[in-house]
């Protein structure tokens, strides 16, 4: 069997019983693909039921933790997709304000859309990202 070239990341600080990895990392020079980050605490409970901003902020925090565990940072993000349970543009704008603020001074392209339902009961926000994978360490110069 060929050597596996993808690392699946499950950060210790996030809900550990999730049935999926929070991010995957390709070899150096590759990409990090996050799972959809959710507004779920380490206990597996949705944070801020009914509160779009609280859920967006928790989701972003979880996304950044997953990216960090994969060796990436907000400045490495190439694109995000933001899902919001709504049919209201006002709600989309509210969530977008939290996302834009969290990524400043970076401004990665994003898709923002309203959806009918997400995976957890009372979940209103989910965000996924694609980021640059960490570069390999430079070898020490020869003496």
Q: Which positions does each model-derived feature cover?
A:
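N-terminal presequence-like segments and the immediate start of the first folded domain
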Residues: 1-61, 65-70, 75-78, 85-143
């Amino acid at each position: 069997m060929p050597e596996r070239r993808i690392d699946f990341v499950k950060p210790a600080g996030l809900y550990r019983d999730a049935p999926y990895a929070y991010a995957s990392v390709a070899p150096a020079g590759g990409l990090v693909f996050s799972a959809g980050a959710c507004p779920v605490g380490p206990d597996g409970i949705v944070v801020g039921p009914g509160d779009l901003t609280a859920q967006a902020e928790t989701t972003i925090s979880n996304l950044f933790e997953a990216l960090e565990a994969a060796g990436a940072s907000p400045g490495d993000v190439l694109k995000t997709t933001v899902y919001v349970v709504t049919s209201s543009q006002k709600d989309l704008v509210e969530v977008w304000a939290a996302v834009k603020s969290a990524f400043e001074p970076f401004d990665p392209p994003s898709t923002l859309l309203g959806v009918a339902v997400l995976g957890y009961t009372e979940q209103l926000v989910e965000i996924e990202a694609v980021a640059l994978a960490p570069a390999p360490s430079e070898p020490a110069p020869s003496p």
